[in-house]
Amino acid sequence: MNEKYEFCSKKWVAFANEYLQGAAVGEDLSGILVTFNEVFTDAPSHLDPDDEGRIGWYLRVENGKVEVERGILDQADLTITVDYTTVLPLARMVFEGNPEGAIEAQETMATAAAAGKMKREGNDAATASLSFMGGLHDALAQRTA
Protein backbone atom coordinates (compact mmCIF):
# COMPACT_ATOMS: atom_id res chain seq x y z
CA MET A 1 0.00 0.00 0.00
CA ASN A 2 1.20 3.49 -0.82
CA GLU A 3 2.15 5.85 1.97
CA LYS A 4 -0.41 8.55 2.72
CA TYR A 5 0.35 12.14 3.63
CA GLU A 6 -1.58 14.81 5.47
CA PHE A 7 -3.23 17.25 3.08
CA CYS A 8 -0.84 20.07 2.10
CA SER A 9 1.88 18.88 4.46
CA LYS A 10 5.51 19.09 3.35
CA LYS A 11 5.47 15.40 2.37
CA TRP A 12 2.21 15.84 0.44
CA VAL A 13 3.68 18.73 -1.55
CA ALA A 14 6.89 16.73 -2.09
CA PHE A 15 4.75 13.95 -3.58
CA ALA A 16 2.96 16.50 -5.81
CA ASN A 17 6.37 17.71 -6.97
CA GLU A 18 7.57 14.16 -7.68
CA TYR A 19 4.38 13.40 -9.62
CA LEU A 20 4.46 16.59 -11.69
CA GLN A 21 8.18 16.34 -12.43
CA GLY A 22 7.60 12.83 -13.76
CA ALA A 23 4.47 13.77 -15.69
CA ALA A 24 6.25 16.70 -17.36
CA VAL A 25 9.08 14.56 -18.77
CA GLY A 26 9.00 14.85 -22.54
CA GLU A 27 6.65 17.85 -22.53
CA ASP A 28 7.71 20.90 -24.54
CA LEU A 29 7.47 23.64 -21.92
CA SER A 30 9.57 26.16 -23.81
CA GLY A 31 7.93 29.56 -23.95
CA ILE A 32 5.45 28.69 -21.21
CA LEU A 33 5.33 30.90 -18.14
CA VAL A 34 2.57 29.93 -15.71
CA THR A 35 2.07 30.22 -11.97
CA PHE A 36 -0.72 28.42 -10.13
CA ASN A 37 -1.37 28.59 -6.39
CA GLU A 38 -3.79 26.78 -4.10
CA VAL A 39 -4.25 28.45 -0.73
CA PHE A 40 -6.09 26.87 2.20
CA THR A 41 -7.53 29.03 4.97
CA ASP A 42 -8.10 28.10 8.61
CA ALA A 43 -5.40 25.42 8.33
CA PRO A 44 -4.52 23.27 11.34
CA SER A 45 -1.85 24.92 13.48
CA HIS A 46 0.53 21.93 13.31
CA LEU A 47 0.87 22.55 9.55
CA ASP A 48 2.55 25.88 10.34
CA PRO A 49 0.14 28.34 8.73
CA ASP A 50 1.03 31.98 8.21
CA ASP A 51 -0.25 34.79 10.47
CA GLU A 52 -3.57 34.67 8.61
CA GLY A 53 -4.00 30.92 9.21
CA ARG A 54 -3.19 29.99 5.61
CA ILE A 55 -1.05 27.32 3.99
CA GLY A 56 -0.66 26.53 0.33
CA TRP A 57 1.32 25.08 -2.50
CA TYR A 58 2.24 26.43 -5.89
CA LEU A 59 3.34 25.37 -9.34
CA ARG A 60 5.57 27.54 -11.48
CA VAL A 61 6.52 26.65 -15.05
CA GLU A 62 9.27 28.89 -16.40
CA ASN A 63 12.16 28.46 -18.82
CA GLY A 64 11.13 24.86 -19.47
CA LYS A 65 11.33 23.93 -15.78
CA VAL A 66 8.62 22.81 -13.37
CA GLU A 67 8.82 24.04 -9.78
CA VAL A 68 6.44 22.81 -7.08
CA GLU A 69 6.80 24.13 -3.54
CA ARG A 70 4.81 24.64 -0.39
CA GLY A 71 3.96 28.30 0.05
CA ILE A 72 1.79 31.21 -0.97
CA LEU A 73 2.74 33.46 -3.87
CA ASP A 74 2.12 37.19 -3.76
CA GLN A 75 0.74 36.93 -7.27
CA ALA A 76 -0.08 34.00 -9.53
CA ASP A 77 -1.80 33.59 -12.87
CA LEU A 78 -4.48 31.61 -11.06
CA THR A 79 -5.00 31.38 -7.32
CA ILE A 80 -7.69 29.22 -5.77
CA THR A 81 -8.34 29.96 -2.11
CA VAL A 82 -10.57 27.64 -0.12
CA ASP A 83 -11.28 26.74 3.48
CA TYR A 84 -9.12 23.76 4.55
CA THR A 85 -11.94 21.83 6.24
CA THR A 86 -14.28 22.35 3.29
CA VAL A 87 -11.82 21.06 0.69
CA LEU A 88 -10.33 18.17 2.71
CA PRO A 89 -12.98 15.54 1.79
CA LEU A 90 -12.64 16.53 -1.88
CA ALA A 91 -8.85 16.27 -1.68
CA ARG A 92 -9.32 12.60 -0.76
CA MET A 93 -11.87 11.88 -3.50
CA VAL A 94 -10.75 10.11 -6.68
CA PHE A 95 -12.74 11.42 -9.66
CA GLU A 96 -11.76 8.96 -12.41
CA GLY A 97 -14.64 6.53 -12.81
CA ASN A 98 -16.58 8.48 -10.18
CA PRO A 99 -18.90 10.96 -11.95
CA GLU A 100 -21.01 11.27 -8.80
CA GLY A 101 -17.94 12.41 -6.88
CA ALA A 102 -17.10 14.98 -9.53
CA ILE A 103 -20.64 16.37 -9.34
CA GLU A 104 -20.46 16.41 -5.54
CA ALA A 105 -17.17 18.31 -5.73
CA GLN A 106 -18.65 20.91 -8.09
CA GLU A 107 -21.65 21.37 -5.81
CA THR A 108 -19.45 21.63 -2.70
CA MET A 109 -17.23 24.24 -4.33
CA ALA A 110 -20.23 26.25 -5.56
CA THR A 111 -21.69 26.22 -2.05
CA ALA A 112 -18.31 27.21 -0.59
CA ALA A 113 -18.01 30.09 -3.06
CA ALA A 114 -21.50 31.32 -2.21
CA ALA A 115 -20.60 31.19 1.50
CA GLY A 116 -17.36 33.11 0.94
CA LYS A 117 -15.19 30.06 1.73
CA MET A 118 -13.77 29.70 -1.79
CA LYS A 119 -12.60 32.12 -4.43
CA ARG A 120 -10.78 31.97 -7.73
CA GLU A 121 -8.55 34.87 -8.71
CA GLY A 122 -6.85 35.30 -12.04
CA ASN A 123 -7.09 33.50 -15.34
CA ASP A 124 -9.08 30.25 -15.14
CA ALA A 125 -7.38 29.11 -18.36
CA ALA A 126 -3.86 29.71 -16.99
CA THR A 127 -3.04 26.02 -16.67
CA ALA A 128 -4.79 24.93 -19.90
CA SER A 129 -1.45 24.42 -21.69
CA LEU A 130 -0.19 22.14 -18.91
CA SER A 131 -1.64 18.81 -20.03
CA PHE A 132 0.73 16.97 -17.68
CA MET A 133 -1.36 18.22 -14.73
CA GLY A 134 -4.31 16.09 -15.84
CA GLY A 135 -3.85 13.22 -13.40
CA LEU A 136 -2.57 15.26 -10.47
CA HIS A 137 -5.78 15.44 -8.45
CA ASP A 138 -6.42 11.70 -8.47
CA ALA A 139 -2.76 10.86 -7.80
CA LEU A 140 -2.84 13.15 -4.77
CA ALA A 141 -6.27 11.92 -3.64
CA GLN A 142 -4.93 8.37 -3.47
CA ARG A 143 -2.12 9.58 -1.21
CA THR A 144 -4.06 12.01 1.00
CA ALA A 145 -4.59 10.75 4.55
Language-model regions, residue ranges each:
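Feature captures hydrophobic
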Residues: M1-A145
